């Protein structure tokens, strides 16, 4: 089927329409993946007094309104409040004390006090945020752990959705799954805003994660099956750029809308335009051909010819001769499992390194993104910048891997990101502008590495286990995204703990990456023996001579990008 693009064009008008229409929907994936940054915000809070407050005392000030005290109050202090009935309370974040003697009002008091729990709820600072799920369901103090599980549970849904929908799409086609998942994104996205308690919120968000991940996986395959080999690298890489646009939209909507359920509805409406037109998308020619639906392939070719203004009709039999079907090939691909990735010590070392790259890339990506709101300065601008720096990073990744090689681009940027993490740890905490700038540089570096690992993994393994290699690497990627929120929560232990963990992982992984063979200009391997020889002078020379004698420049990456998103 690859010859089809030599005839109709590798990225003609028809492909451009499908590409931008389908890639547009990946914006919503970026939105939902990071929406919790502002949905689950914990503002300043303090235990609620049982009645109406008439006076508020701070260590060095007094006011009549609690709203006026938030700016001066810090969590290490308690508030002294006098109620309209004369009772005096000392309010902490997770407890409150009632003074026995209410005859005089002072901040400091050495008399008897009675300890009470926060059974009346909490006061929240609403100066910058009207509501979040934390304020809605009091996810603080002994319920704080529930708030911290929101993003990991979502990422677990991402992992499961990628596995389930990727497999179903191979069985029933890409188009039905695109319909189901994009519609699911809209419906579940809206439903999240109307959940009635924490548990219903988490369940619906989990389902939203599954369909969002399913769409992202399948649309990646869908688009690469419509783009010819000459444009496939750039086209597949820049699907990620649409995801980055979604991250920027999250920051913009979060800045404008401070009520969590309205914020969620507005973000979910970005899905609606695609839902209304996704039924018009055709099935891919690769999947139709693999299912023996040749008449539908012929019909699709006629449509592409019309859109791309191809004047000379061509038959499917001319593009795909019978001898290219390789009827016996599938039987050779069924007997392999993940243990084959540990074929020998050399392969085991290669696989462990590749898995570490996937894990570290995902870990660093989400740590930089999720932690951006903790850097100081304007948290909305910080998140916007983390999305904005991704777009040029993919351009650099494309240029680098085509000019200096995959390994020679990947390893330096991993090491650079590690160095940047170290530099961030040395910056004084009052220099927030410098910290933000270095964090953006770190996000840029890790995004370069994360962007090209899909293709590099496929090139490192032979045809018989290539799907397994990319699929298992993708699984490590999802695990990294589940772990990332917990790393960010370690700022409670030490503010630079996330950067330290990412820095250590990136440095070790970058060094190990240097032990991998370079694949730029090297034909794809078909057997374990050929792949094992990759990187040796004799192996490269022998295989280059073989491909040149057959008049082949490089084996097409037909199934590489299909499995890259699995």
From Swiss-Prot:
Gene Ontology cellular-component annotations: membrane
Alphabetically ordered keywords of this record: Glycoprotein, Ion transport, Membrane, Transmembrane, Transmembrane helix, Transport
Entry's localization field: Membrane
Membrane topology: Multi-pass membrane protein
Gene Ontology molecular functions: organic cation transmembrane transporter activity
Gene3D superfamilies according to UniProt: MFS general substrate transporter like domains
Family recorded in the similarity comment: Belongs to the major facilitator (TC 2.A.1) superfamily. Organic cation transporter (TC 2.A.1.19) family.
TM regions (residue ranges): 20-40, 149-169, 176-196, 201-221, 237-257, 261-281, 351-371, 381-401, 408-428, 436-456, 468-488, 493-513
InterPro entries (UniProt xref): MFS_dom, MFS_sugar_transport-like, MFS_trans_sf
Protein's recorded name: Solute carrier family 22 member 16
Glycan-linked positions: 52, 60, 112, 344
Disulphide bonds in the chain: none
Lineage, highest ranks first: Eukaryota, Metazoa, Chordata, Craniata, Vertebrata
């Amino acid at each position: 089927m690859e010859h089809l693009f030599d005839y109709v064009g590798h990225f003609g008008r028809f492909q451009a329409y499908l590409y931008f229409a389908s890639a547009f929907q990946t914006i919503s994936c970026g939105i939902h993946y990071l929406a919790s940054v502002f949905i689950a915000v914990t503002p300043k809070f303090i235990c609620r007094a049982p009645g109406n407050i008439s006076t508020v005392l701070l260590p060095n000030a007094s006011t009549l309104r609690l709203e006026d005290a938030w700016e001066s109050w810090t969590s290490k202090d308690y508030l002294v409040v006098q109620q309209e009935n004369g009772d005096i309370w000392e309010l902490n974040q997770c407890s409150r004390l009632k003074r026995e003697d209410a005859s005089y009002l002072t901040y400091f008091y050495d008399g008897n006090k009675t300890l009470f729990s926060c059974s009346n709820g909490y006061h929240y600072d609403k100066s910058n945020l009207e509501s979040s799920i934390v304020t809605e369901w009091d996810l603080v103090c002994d319920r704080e752990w529930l708030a911290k599980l929101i993003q990991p549970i979502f990422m677990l849904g991402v992992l499961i959705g990628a596995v389930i929908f990727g497999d179903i799409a191979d069985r029933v086609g890409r188009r039905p799954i695109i319909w189901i998942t994009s519609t699911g994104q809209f419906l579940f996205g809206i439903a999240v805003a109307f959940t009635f308690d924490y548990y219903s919120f988490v369940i619906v968000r989990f389902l939203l994660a599954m369909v969002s991940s399913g769409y992202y996986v399948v649309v990646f395959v869908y688009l690469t099956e419509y783009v010819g080999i000459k444009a496939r690298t750039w086209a597949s890489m820049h699907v990620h750029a649409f995801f980055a646009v979604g991250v920027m939209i999250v920051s913009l909507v979060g800045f404008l809308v401070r009520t969590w359920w309205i914020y969620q509805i507005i973000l979910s409406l970005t899905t609606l335009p695609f839902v209304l037109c996704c039924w018009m998308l055709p099935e891919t020619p690769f999947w139709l051909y693999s299912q023996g639906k040749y008449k539908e392939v012929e019909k699709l070719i006629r449509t592409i010819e019309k859109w791309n203004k191809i004047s000379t009709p061509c038959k499917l039999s001319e593009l795909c001769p019978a001898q290219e079907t390789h009827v016996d090939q599938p039987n050779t691909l069924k007997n392999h499992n993940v243990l084959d990735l540990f074929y020998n010590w050399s392969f085991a070392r290669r696989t462990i390194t590749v898995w570490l790259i996937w894990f570290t890339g995902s870990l660093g990506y989400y740590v930089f993104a999720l932690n951006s709101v903790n850097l100081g300065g304007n948290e909305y601008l910080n998140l916007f910048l983390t999305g904005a720096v991704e777009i040029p990073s993919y351009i650099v990744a494309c240029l680098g891997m085509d000019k200096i090689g995959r390994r020679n681009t990947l390893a330096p940027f991993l090491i650079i990101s590690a160095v940047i993490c170290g530099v961030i740890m040395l910056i004084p905490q009052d220099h927030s502008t410098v910290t933000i700038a270095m964090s953006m540089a770190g996000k840029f570096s890790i995004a370069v590495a994360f962007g090209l690992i899909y293709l590099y993994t496929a090139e490192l393994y032979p045809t018989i286990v290539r799907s397994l290699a990319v699929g298992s690497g993708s699984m490590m990627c999802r695990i990294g995204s589940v772990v990332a929120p917990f790393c960010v929560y370690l700022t409670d232990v030490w503010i630079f703990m996330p950067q330290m963990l990412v820095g250590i992982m990136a440095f070790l992984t970058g060094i190990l990456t240097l032990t991998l063979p370079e694949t730029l200009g090297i034909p794809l391997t078909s057997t374990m023996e050929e792949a094992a020889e990759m990187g040796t002078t004799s192996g490269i020379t022998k295989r280059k001579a073989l491909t040149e004698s057959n008049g082949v420049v490089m084996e097409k990456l037909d199934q590489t990008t299909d499995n890259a998103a699995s």
